[in-house]
Amino acid sequence: RCKPCFTTDPQMSKKCADCCGGXKX
């Protein structure tokens, strides 16, 4: 599941992008 993508951690941001397809999410 995709969680809200708002973080300053590059590692988390990358994971988020992989999940949200751009971290918008």
Swiss-Prot record:
Keywords, ordered alphabetically: Chloride channel impairing toxin, Disulfide bond, Ion channel impairing toxin, Secreted, Toxin, Voltage-gated chloride channel impairing toxin
SUPFAM superfamilies per record: Scorpion toxin-like
Cysteines paired by S-S bonds: 2-19
Domain of life: Eukaryota
Subcellular location(s) of the protein: Secreted
InterPro entries assigned: Scorpion_toxin-like_sf (IPR036574), Scorpion_toxinS_Cl_inh (IPR007958)
GO molecular function ontology, one term from the record: toxin activity
One GO CC term on file: extracellular region
Tissue: Expressed by the venom gland.
Function description: Toxin with unknown function in healthy organisms. On glioma cells, interacts with chloride channels (probably ClC-3/CLCN3) and MMP2 at the surface of glioma cells. This complex is then internalized via caveolae, thus inhibiting the chloride channels necessary for cell shrinkage and tumor propagation.
Assigned protein family: Belongs to the short scorpion toxin superfamily. Chloride channel inhibitor family.
Full protein name: Toxin PBITx1
Organism the protein comes from: Parabuthus schlechteri
Organism taxonomic ancestry: Eukaryota, Metazoa, Ecdysozoa, Arthropoda, Chelicerata
